[in-house]
Amino acid sequence: MGSELKIENLNVKVSDKQVLFDLNLTVAGGQIHAIMGPNGSGKSTLASSILKKPGYEIISGSIFVEGTDITTMSPYEIAQQNMFVSGQYPLEIPGVTVIDLLSASSVVEKSEQEIQRIGESLSIPKDLLERGLNVELSGGERKRLDIFQLLVTMPKICVLDELDSGLDVDALEELAAKVYSLSKETSMTVLVITHYARILEILKPDKVHVLRGGKITKSGGFELATELEITGYDN
């Protein structure tokens, strides 16, 4: 059984403007949940708050990973909880490659050969793995590196913000299928944040939540995502 991700009464502000209001969400261990919503609804703010990205201030509320309160933890401490968060605009780190980062991680248990095979399975060129982390990369390249890190570290929980951004249809289907397979093989808990239902056709979420005005206003199964594609968020 995977680890539970629980968010209780989360209030977050960005640049002195409150964006999330008393947000509550529980993703049971091993489940896949999706958050959908219009632009400006607070979707990426939620991911950035979990990641503890600078500029996102948690006013009140708590975030728990398997019962452990991570609300005041640093990004490094959160990573030690075996949790992976992929943001829309990852930090660029010149001089530090993704291989350097993974080598320094205490949660990586794969051999060099296994890591190399994972890179090959994602069609990641060797020079990309040797480049500074997220430096001068396209949106698609960044997403491939995110999934590469995910497959190498095999976290208990992953949060993916706009995985479909910057990817063509074939690449999106390929990467989403790898996330789905890893979740089913390892009981990894997944929270995916997206605008579109297409990725959810592959991820087959247990639950879909609608985020509007900084609050979750509706929850349901995959059929909710299909409904939103037809009716939009105003109905």
Where are these regions (language model features)?
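The feature captures the beta-strand-to-loop junction immediately N-terminal to the Walker
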Residues: 36-38
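Q-loop/switch helix immediately C-terminal to the Walker
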Residues: 88-89, 94-114
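ABC ATPase NBD Q-loop/coupling interface
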Residues: 62-78, 134
